[in-house]
């Protein structure tokens, strides 16, 4: 592990003074402005405790023990319980009579009407007695649909069902919008039958419910959730697909007693069915970019031709890689992998498919990388990023320009250039290969990205060099202990955090409160764990006299047609009010 301080010295020692580019941020919330000006007493912060880490303990039903970070079951159960509670209140107010109810047996088909859409993207339908819920995929509020019951969770008052057909469509359903022949069975998408406008509104509601239900904060401390930032592309946006198959062909149809071996059967290659542990054979996925879709076709053919060489199943990789070749440069021979941004590409690591797109000053060449350890290249505006193809990088390139521009616009508070101690340092925790450190770098005198992954730091340093950013450094360290050696004054530091789905550890949040960065940008792929973590920051540490106030929260639609939404929250450091003398 590299020492953070020595790593920073290597790139800060040669820095000359430079002009800090101040970008106007949105005004702080009304509550924040009022407290700063009047030192008004802070009201009770919590209406109940924030949700704990999603460990599955409250669920009596069996869950995937390897997927503790997603919180899918807890989020679904929260929506179910709230629907039941609202219905119970309505029945009490109208003196509704109790209706006898007998839970149908598994695999029975029944007709139900969808009451609402859950944060998981599933429809929720009340049983006749109003005290039990059917979870129905691929539906919208108002739909009357036929479903097949597949799994009961009686102690939790709900059952999972398979969608069979629409009896009467709800007002938000438009099946003409469905762009995939597998929709309705594949678990990958949930919302293709909804207009994009309705999808964005639904995702805004997901963020609202996350903060209302999982933070425990009183409503006055949660700003109005901003409108969901739209993806420029709603199909054809995914730069990475990872289909899989369950078993290989080795040992099947093998030669015995001198006989010629029979051709082994090729298993389904694709994604899982909804509500089943079975794979669908997926020939094409319209969410993938053009080159990724070509790669899927090529890889399916390759696997089928070589299935006997697989002893077991496997997960395949299709990752888009982009090269920009100046028009005045020598033309690239067909099939030859170019050198991109001064970083050597990996030969023989792609499917051989090439798509060329002519731009004003250059030609883009797109290839589909299939080797997890090969280098892939991606551009965000004019910034170039190289990564191991199997490593994490955002999968929707079409939204990244607007996404990073939004964060740049929020990074520096209004009036920063007039402050006696302006923010001029960036600390990027969970930095990965440097997306935020690099795209925010022009705003700061010095920027430091930290990540636990050694491979990510290697890529990040290469990316800083390729983008000619001498004021940007990276260090390998555990994010839970990174604050111990940060060389920046907290009063002048912006902290960016982008943790995995499970959110920040309690130790990380405790150390962050000890460090006291002046401003925080919290980016999250799980708005429910984000809400939980931000509640800890808002509660603060009274002994350290530090807490945070939420300036803004907004969702970003990285994955159109799915129930997933990412969140960006901006927070400002403040202190506890001083008790008035008696």
PLM regions and their residue ranges:
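Terminal RNA-binding accessory module
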Residues: 33, 38-178, 182
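Extended interfacial segments that mediate partner engagement and assembly in macromolecular machines
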Residues: 167-178, 184-304
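N-terminal mitochondrial targeting presequence
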Residues: 1-46
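Hydrophobic beta-strand signal
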Residues: 146-148, 242, 317
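Short, low-complexity Ser/Thr-rich regulatory SLiMs
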Residues: 151-153, 245-249, 320-322, 557, ...
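Rossmann-like S-adenosyl-L-methionine
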Residues: 31-34, 47-53, 58-59, 64-91, ...
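Short, acidic/hydrophobic/Gly-rich beta-strand patch recurrent on exposed beta strands
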Residues: 123-128, 268-274, 460
């Amino acid at each position: 592990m590299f020492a953070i301080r020595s790593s920073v010295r290597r790139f800060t020692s040669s820095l000359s003074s430079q002009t800090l580019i101040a970008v106007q941020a949105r005004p702080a919330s009304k509550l924040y402005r009022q407290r700063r000006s009047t030192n008004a007493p802070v009201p009770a912060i919590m209406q109940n405790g924030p949700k704990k880490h999603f460990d599955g303990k409250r669920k009596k039903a069996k869950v995937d023990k390897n997927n503790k970070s997603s919180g899918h079951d807890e989020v679904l159960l929260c929506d179910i319980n709230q629907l039941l509670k609202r219905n119970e209140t309505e029945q009490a107010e109208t003196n509704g009579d109790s209706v006898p109810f007998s839970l149908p047996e598994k695999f029975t088909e029944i007709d139900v009407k969808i009451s609402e859409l859950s944060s998981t993207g599933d429809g929720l339908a009340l049983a006749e007695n109003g005290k039990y819920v059917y979870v129905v995929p691929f539906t919208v509020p108002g739909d009357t649909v036929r479903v097949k019951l597949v799994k009961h969770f009686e102690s939790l008052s709900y059952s999972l069902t398979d969608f069979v057909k629409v009896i009467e469509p709800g007002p938000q359903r438009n099946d003409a919008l469905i762009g995939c022949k597998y929709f309705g069975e594949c678990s990958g998408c949930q919302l293709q039958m909804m207009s994009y406008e309705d999808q964005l509104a639904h995702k805004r509601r997901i963020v609202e419910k996350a903060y209302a239900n999982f933070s425990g904060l009183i409503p006055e401390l949660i700003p109005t959730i901003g409108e969901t930032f739209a993806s420029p592309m709603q199909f054809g946006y995914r730069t990475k697909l990872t289909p899989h198959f369950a078993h290989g062909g080795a040992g099947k149809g093998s030669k015995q007693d001198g006989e010629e071996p029979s051709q082994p059967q090729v298993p389904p290659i694709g994604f899982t069915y909804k509500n089943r542990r079975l794979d669908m054979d997926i020939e094409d996925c319209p969410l993938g970019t053009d080159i990724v879709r070509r790669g899927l076709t090529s890889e399916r053919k390759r696997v089928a031709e070589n299935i006997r060489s697989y002893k077991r199943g496997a997960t395949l990789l299709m990752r888009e890689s982009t090269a920009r070749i100046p028009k005045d440069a020598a033309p690239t021979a067909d099939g030859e992998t170019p050198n991109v941004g001064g970083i050597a590409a990996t030969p023989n690591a792609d499917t051989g498919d090439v798509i060329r797109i002519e731009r004003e000053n250059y030609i883009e060449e797109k290839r589909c990388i299939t080797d997890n350890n090969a280098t892939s290249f991606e551009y965000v505006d004019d910034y170039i990023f190289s990564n191991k193809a199997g490593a994490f990088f955002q999968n929707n390139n079409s939204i990244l320009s607007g996404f990073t521009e939004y964060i740049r616009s929020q990074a520096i508070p209004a009036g920063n250039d007039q402050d006696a101690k302006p923010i001029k340092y960036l600390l990027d925790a969970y930095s990965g290969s440097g997306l935020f450190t690099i795209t925010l770098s022009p705003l700061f005198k010095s920027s430091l990205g930290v990540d636990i992954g050694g491979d990510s730091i290697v890529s990040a340093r290469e990316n800083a060099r390729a983008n000619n950013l001498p004021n940007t450094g990276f260090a390998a360290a555990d994010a839970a202990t990174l604050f111990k050696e940060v060389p920046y004054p907290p009063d002048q530091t912006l902290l960016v955090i982008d943790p995995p789905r499970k959110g920040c550890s309690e130790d990380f949040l405790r150390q962050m409160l000890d460090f006291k960065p002046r401003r925080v940008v919290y980016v999250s792929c799980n708005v429910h764990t984000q809400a939980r973590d931000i509640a800890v920051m808002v509660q603060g540490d009274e002994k350290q006299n530090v807490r945070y106030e939420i300036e803004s929260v907004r969702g970003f639609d990285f994955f159109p047609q799915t129930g997933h939404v990412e969140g960006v929250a901006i927070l400002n450091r403040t202190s506890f009010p001083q008790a008035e003398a008696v």
